[in-house]
């Protein structure tokens, strides 16, 4: 064992002694090239950011408002808005609040639409929320994820005094939808890279929680199933 250890130790020493001297000039040259390339790439980020911001600010949406849809299947739009609550949506390019009724009850639709998402005006933001946590009248009671035929949504119960609402919320980024803000950010990057689209939306449906949760959820699902395809087409056209 001593012999074997000595053999490897001697062999390594011989290898080190016989190894060619490193070409420090070549290494310095390559290091300089890599450093210059890295600095060039890094320097492009502010320029890219500036261009994206400039394009966002210079590109005005063709629509001055989100078009109103008079009915989704059996759900008819009220000519007079009857809102009792609104989500907090920070600096959307366009905003819509409408109330729809059927023999099942009433549903409020809210959309905050961002034609060109940019710093301070984007669908996924801590400024966009269902209630004001700092002294607002409405409070979040509970939240859970609910499956639909298209994609899961975030279901939240909010309350004020003796009144409660059941709210469904999700994001639309380009033509991709999710309730998750993390996945929505990924979708935003994906749409920017592969389709050049920068539009996004913060969407909620709400209904009074006067009876049991199952009945209120059934109303939301009925409206959702009859409205989602038309809403998607509407927002897709706005994002062109």
What are these regions (language model features)?
Residues 40, 67-68, 92, 195:
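Generic detector of ordered secondary-structure context
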Residues 52-72:
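Alpha-helical transmembrane signal-anchor/signal-peptide segments
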